[in-house]
Curated annotation (Swiss-Prot):
It is an enzyme of class 3 (hydrolase). GO terms for molecular function: hydrolase activity, acting on ester bonds. When transfected in S.cerevisiae, it can complement the absence of yeast of PER1 protein, suggesting a conserved role in lipid remodeling steps of GPI-anchor maturation. Ubiquitously expressed, with highest levels in thyroid and placenta. One of its GO terms (biological process) is GPI anchor metabolic process. The gene is PGAP3. It comes from the Eukaryota. This is GPI-specific phospholipase A2-like PGAP3. GO terms for cellular component: endoplasmic reticulum membrane; Golgi membrane. It is linked to Hyperphosphatasia with impaired intellectual development syndrome 4: An autosomal recessive neurologic disorder characterized by profound developmental delay, severe intellectual disability, no speech, psychomotor delay, postnatal microcephaly, and elevated serum alkaline phosphatase. Keywords: Disease variant, Glycoprotein, Golgi apparatus, GPI-anchor biosynthesis, Hydrolase, Intellectual disability, Membrane, Signal, Transmembrane, Transmembrane helix.
Length: 320
């Protein structure tokens, strides 16, 4: 929810550097890649590379050029450490030790676990909350949107390409917009359905324009950063305002307050930017791991709130 906004901010900052970082600007790195490609990525040498490349690597889209970049990255890192220098970044990222076809193993596994937690909580929600609850379909839709975002986050951390990067960004933006929509339905829509319909159309238009501009015109990291910070702030303020207004009347909304505050606090982990521990675990992966129980708590809030609304609507029906 709110934490995705912080994640997008930091992803945008990293991506803005992706066109050139200290490591990939080094002549030794560039010369190494060029020489590796000349020796291994054409003619008979390329056929030899393909014949010895594991099938899972080729299926994941790892090419000879990618392998050259990976090997030369570690050559450059070794030289830096030999000379007593700090570990450099390459294309806006720290060097990670690849495991099988996973480019960033810890972040990929953590993203998968976030998705798994969301799936488990979705199944629990559908088991314990009747479909007649006023928020049922909106909450289920939010869960599927979240699952889709975590799927693409897992794919992106498994294999960083232009496509997977864009899908990770776009799906994360969709989650934040859907969280705003979820808040609108809960705070306004149950009494004023027409307002929600108009607001839903507005959000869909915003998402369409946003994705179209970044896909068809140019991927502007600066614009993407500003847009996602703006919608993230709207999301945080709206949820917090509603929770604080209703916390005495509805004790279960305290779970939502904890979720929003925790996600904001945990996002500070991303500011602790450091080279990966054991070349696997960086601040971003730690942040992903730490959000797993937070998502469970948010779905628990949605379950409690949906059951409360169901009881309220049933009581009102009896009175009528």
């Amino acid at each position: 929810m709110a934490g995705l906004a912080a994640r997008l901010v930091l992803l945008a900052g990293a991506a803005a550097l992706a066109s050139g970082s200290q490591g990939d600007r080094e002549p030794v790195y560039r010369d190494c890649v060029l020489q590796c490609e000349e020796q291994n990525c054409s003619g008979g040498a390329l056929n030899h590379f393909r014949s010895r490349q594991p099938i899972y690597m080729s299926l994941a889209g790892w090419t000879c050029r990618d392998d050259c970049k990976y090997e030369c990255m570690w050559v450059t890192v070794g030289l830096y450490l030999q000379e007593g220098h700090k570990v450099p970044q390459f294309h806006g990222k720290w060097p990670f030790s690849r495991f099988l076809f996973f480019q960033e193993p810890a972040s990929a596994v953590a993203s998968f676990l976030n998705g798994l937690a969301s799936l488990v909580m979705l199944c629990r929600y559908r088991t314990f909350v009747p479909a007649s609850s006023p928020m049922y379909h909106t909450c289920v839709a939010f869960a599927w949107v979240s699952l889709n975002a975590w799927f693409w986050s897992t794919v992106f951390h498994t294999r960083d390409t232009d496509l997977t990067e864009k899908m990770d960004y776009f799906c994360a933006s969709t989650v934040i917009l859907h969280s705003i929509y979820l808040c609108c339905v809960r705070t306004v829509g149950l009494q004023h359905p027409a307002v929600v319909s108009a607001f839903r159309a507005l959000l869909l238009l915003m998402l369409t324009v946003h994705v179209s501009y970044l896909s068809l015109i140019r991927f502007d990291y600066g614009y993407n950063l500003v847009a996602n910070v703006a919608i993230g702030l709207v999301n945080v303020v709206w949820w917090l305002a509603w929770c604080l207004w209703n916390q005495r009347r509805l004790p279960h909304v305290r779970k939502c307050v904890v979720v929003v505050l925790l996600l904001q606090g945990l996002s500070l982990l991303e500011l602790l930017d450091f080279p990966p521990l054991f070349w696997v675990l960086d601040a971003h992966a730690i942040w992903h791991i730490s959000t797993i129980p937070v998502h469970v708590l948010f779905f628990s809030f949605l379950e409690d709130d949906s059951l409360y609304l169901l009881k309220e609507s049933e009581d009102k029906f009896k009175l009528d």
